[in-house]
């Protein structure tokens, strides 16, 4: 089952690369995170241009705080603790429309999985979010298969015992069309979903309670807006890269360019979460 109650959430460790050149940079970064609810500890390493944050906040929120100092920040890894890396994954969502986003998965404990991310381009309101059976994008999101359901259950909400394992409930987009979320789930395991897909839908998931013929199948949440394959990603201290071997871009140059495609050759202004 999933949880989004702040007092029940499990803190994770976020590893950021932050452009810092002097002690005043360190002081500014430290002040930006000082006293922020949901941040439990901060370690700033000038020599490594690294900031470690133990927090229950979404990584996008912490990154925005760091970049409010006028310095670029790149999330390089996540972990459940400094000395433990169970498994981590990421899905980069896109489709034929304007919806795009990044969603990260982290196995906090053998029994508890963190799902957090930012999705842009949505209509304000609730949108169903689900892990689907296949990592097949040959027909955009229509080839992703049904909800991930190895237990043969009916569709339900993340708090229900009778639910698909891929049922993550709803995320809420604000007036600007951005959904920033963090949830924990006791059924989903990162190692079970790598290679599958994550899909965001056009409407609200009724959590199996709507009485519609699709309620117990899909939650009647409408068309699939955007999707991405769930792939392994770096845990803490597992991503030492400073320069991309494929094209020679530094992590700071990558921060201001698309992840792939022709646009990567020229500077571009990306969404803040990429």
UniProtKB/Swiss-Prot annotation:
Record region (Superoxide dismutase-like): 88-234
Function text: Delivers copper to copper zinc superoxide dismutase (SOD1).
GO molecular function, one term: copper ion binding
Name of the protein: Copper chaperone for superoxide dismutase
Quaternary structure, from the entry: Homodimer, and heterodimer with SOD1. Interacts with COMMD1. Interacts with XIAP/BIRC4. Interacts with SLC31A1(via C-terminal domain); this interaction is Cu(1+)-mediated. The heterodimer CCS:SOD1 interacts with SLC31A1; this heterotrimer is Cu(1+)-mediated and its maintenance is regulated through SOD1 activation.
Amino acids binding Cu cation 2: 244, 246
Signal sequence extent: none
Cross-link (Glycyl lysine isopeptide (Lys-Gly) (interchain with G-Cter in ubiquitin)): 76, 189, 216, 241
Residue sites binding Zn(2+) per the record: 147, 155, 164, 167
GO annotation terms (biological process): removal of superoxide radicals
Disulphides: 141-227
Residues annotated to bind Cu cation 1: 22, 25
Subcellular location: Cytoplasm
Posttranslational mods: Ubiquitinion by XIAP/BIRC4 leads to enhancement of its chaperone activity toward its physiologic target, SOD1, rather than proteasomal degradation. XIAP/BIRC4 preferentially ubiquitinates at Lys-241.
Biological classification of the source: Eukaryota, Metazoa, Chordata, Craniata, Vertebrata
């Amino acid at each position: 089952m999933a949880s989004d109650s702040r007092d029940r959430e499990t803190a994770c460790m976020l590893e950021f690369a932050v452009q810092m050149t002097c002690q005043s940079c360190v002081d500014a970064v430290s002040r930006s995170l000082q006293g922020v609810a949901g941040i439990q500890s901060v370690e700033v390493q000038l020599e490594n241009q690294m900031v470690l944050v133990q927090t229950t906040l979404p990584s996008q929120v912490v990154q925005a705080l760091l970049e409010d100092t006028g310095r670029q920040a790149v999330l390089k890894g996540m972990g459940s603790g400094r000395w433990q890396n169970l498994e981590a994954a990421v899905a980069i969502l896109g489709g034929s429309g304007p919806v795009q986003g990044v969603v990260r998965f982290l196995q906090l404990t053998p029994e508890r999985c963190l799902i957090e991310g930012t999705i842009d381009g949505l209509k304000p309101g609730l949108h169903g979010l689900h892990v689907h059976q296949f990592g097949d994008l040959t027909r955009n999101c229509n080839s992703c298969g049904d909800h991930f359901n190895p237990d043969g259950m009916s569709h339900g909400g993340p708090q229900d015992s009778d639910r698909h394992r891929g049922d993550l409930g709803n995320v809420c987009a604000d007036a600007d069309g951005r959904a920033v979320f963090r949830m924990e789930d006791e059924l989903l395991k990162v190692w079970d979903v790598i290679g599958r897909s994550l899909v965001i839908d056009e409407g609200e998931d009724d959590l199996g309670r709507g009485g519609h013929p699709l309620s117990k199948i899909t939650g009647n949440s409408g068309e699939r807006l955007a999707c991405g394959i769930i792939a392994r990603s770096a845990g803490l201290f597992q991503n030492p890269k400073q320069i991309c071997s494929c094209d020679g871009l530094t992590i700071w140059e990558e921060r201001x360019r698309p992840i792939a495609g022709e646009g990567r050759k020229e500077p571009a202004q990306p969404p803040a979460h990429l």
